[in-house]
Amino acid sequence: MDLHEYPRPANDTGIGVHWTVGFASTIGMGKIRDFWIPELKAMGVKWVKIFNHDGAIDFAELLLAEGLMPVVRIYRPSPYPSAFDLRDVVHIDALIRAGVRYFEFNPEPDQDTEWKGGRVPANAIELAVENIITNLDTILERGGMPAIPAVSNGSRWDLVGKIVARGRKDIFNGPVWHAIHNYSRNRPLDYPYDIGNQEGASYTLRFYQTLADETWGEDAWRGRALHEINKLRLERCNPGATIMDDNACWLAYEFMDARNRRHLGRSIPILSTECGYLVGEDGDARYPATTPDLHMAQTLE
């Protein structure tokens, strides 16, 4: 299926939000219609990911009527190893009748929390791919557009490659897309190509002090002095590094696209179903923890 054949909202901005994981019906369709829909439109949002909880069909119909594209996750706690049950299929059918096309299911199969028993087994990727193929076929047969499940941020799991290796490259002739969770961590948006990672460029005193003075209840530098930060940046720089070396960042979609093209000979659509900056995140010590001001600036960027 060619890219232009995938349905998109009118005047698509590419901007989306992940709705609360709770029940849409908790606050009521009236408040969503009167308050939240105008807020979404004011921000330029065109895509809204929701869960298939009670009220999801009404919510999806409202989004479609307002020119927004719903992406529905079929929620199943600790779903692996298993495929959709009858209840899931009935709900998928109802959502498709309501106009929903994009479906997501069972993300991050590389994480313990997604497996019954709470642990990823040794042959997890093989078991997961078996279930994923079954679910993809189920949604495709009903006229839906399923996602290859997202793996966790920075994971090297190659689900597309495994599906192709099982002789099911034909699945990608249909309207399949790829979900990703390209969380930025506390790294800049152009990581790994930023000057800090490539050359170990030093922070200025002005930048350091601006973040140090921000009042938010935590220390952006985690007690490290400027000279300590700059020493760390120089020692841990990675000249020539590309996204293929480290994809735990915003640009993870470039990594996924390169692998997909290698396996399929072409790109397939990639939609980020979880991403962004998290206040307080500090996984890479070469960069400041994400403060509220940094969160705002980098999100707007």
Language-model region placement:
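Boundary/entry segment of secreted carbohydrate-active catalytic domains
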Residues: 1-54
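Ligand-binding grooves and catalytic loops that recognize ribose/phosphate and carbohydrate rings
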Residues: 2-12, 16-18, 72-128
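Short, structured coil segments at secondary-structure junctions
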Residues: 43-44, 66-67, 98-99, 142
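Conserved residues at the C-terminal ends of beta-strands
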Residues: 51, 106, 181
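Noncatalytic carbohydrate-binding groove/subsite architecture in carbohydrate-active enzymes
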Residues: 56-93, 122-296, 300
